[in-house]
Amino acid sequence: MIFNKVIERISILKNRCRSSECSIIGVLFRMLMFRLVYKKNILTSPKVKIKNIKNIKFNKNSNLIVGLSNVNHVNNNSICYINNRGEMHVSGNVFIAKSVRVDIADSSKIILNDCYIGPETDLISYSGISIGKGSMVSWRVQFLDEDFHLVSYNDKKPKDGKITIGENCLIGNNVAINKGCIIADGCVVASHSVVNGVFLEKNCLIAGVPARVIKRNISWQH
């Protein structure tokens, strides 16, 4: 039984490596290095660069798989870069596709829970980003929890920069998720939307520039 599971996992990994045009030997070597040196369950292609691996925290039986998804419109030679100056917390199986860029500031934390991050997505965090269980992020999505440039005006209210994506959400391609956004469980954000607000109602379709709720009581399938 155990032998059959091992063979099945090797077969899945072999297919992933073939579709990503990378050597299974190189992938296995990196996996062993992460296990032996850092005690981390990380599986990556050779085109992945991770700084400060020690700052990645894993819950029990959790795995981080980076750069091994088959995405036809993304060059297999593109680099996936994770600059982890703060903390990254991984729960369940977290998949990060090719050409994703992650930058976590010293004071920040990114929490990824059994989710998928699509190719060419940027997660730039100076306050905190949390993506819930079962959520999927499409390609070229930008998460940005910091303004970088101060704009002052009368009656300006302070705003918590943290971004929270609930469970089982779908974020469409080319969406901008900005500082202070909260998206409730089961919501779908339509492609090319710009999300600036707080959406606490579950199972809504959110769309537009700026984004607003356009449908309620929706459902979607993986």
UniProtKB/Swiss-Prot annotation:
List the InterPro entries: Hexapep, Hexapeptide_acetyltransf, Trimer_LpxA-like_sf
Q: Domain of life here?
A: Bacteria
Q: Which SUPFAM superfamilies match?
A: Trimeric LpxA-like enzymes
Q: State what protein this is by name.
A: Uncharacterized 24.8 kDa protein in cps region
Name the source organism. Answer: Klebsiella pneumoniae
